[in-house]
């Protein structure tokens, strides 16, 4: 596997409203663990759409990993131009920082938002251009990742395409592990 698409929930879907929320660190640890196994097996590119939440936290994880694995690259393919246009200023600044550090940035539709069809095109693009999908996603709480996860599963039924998930139970395990380590 050379290219993996990473996605997951938006912050508000997780009850997270600031990047210094303890849950963010937990999610980043889970992403790091999964991505590390893929990097050790030859992963070269992580692709995201630049969505707030899991995707931008994954970008931070990639930047941290690039210190030890300089061949690991991050590409941000936005579904449309200026997706950050209506975001709060601190979210825009954070997003722009991620874009400035990414190895490749492009827009899939090359135009500003016009319709939900652009999100569908984004999902198709990500599934076509990647070898696998990694999602912070739990089927019991579908949320925004639902559609790309469904597309990935459909592709997996007819081709050698894998979907990997970080479940809420995985995050709970990390929290318990941290509590155990801090108690010692």
From Swiss-Prot:
Q: Which InterPro entries match?
A: YspA
The record's similarity note reads:
Belongs to the UPF0398 family.
Q: Quote the protein name from its UniProt record.
A: UPF0398 protein BCB4264_A1614
């Amino acid at each position: 596997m050379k290219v993996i698409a990473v996605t997951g929930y938006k912050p508000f879907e997780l009850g997270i409203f600031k990047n210094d929320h303890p849950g963010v660190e937990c999610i980043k640890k889970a992403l790091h663990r999964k991505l590390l196994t893929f990097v050790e097996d030859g992963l070269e590119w992580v692709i995201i759409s630049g969505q707030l939440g899991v995707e931008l936290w994954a970008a931070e994880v990639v930047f941290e990993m690039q210190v030890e694995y300089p061949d690991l690259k991050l590409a941000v393919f936005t579904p449309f131009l200026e997706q950050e246009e209506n975001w709060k200023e601190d979210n825009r600044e954070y997003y722009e920082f991620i874009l400035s550090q990414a190895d490749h940035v492009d827009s899939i539709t090359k135009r500003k938002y016009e319709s939900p069809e652009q999100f569908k095109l984004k999902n198709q693009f990500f599934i076509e251009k990647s070898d696998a999908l990694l999602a912070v996603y739990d089927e019991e709480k579908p949320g925004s990742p639902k559609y790309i996860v469904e597309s990935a599963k459909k592709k997996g039924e007819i081709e050698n395409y894998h979907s990997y998930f970080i479940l809420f139970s995985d995050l709970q395990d990390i929290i318990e592990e941290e509590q155990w380590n801090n108690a010692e």
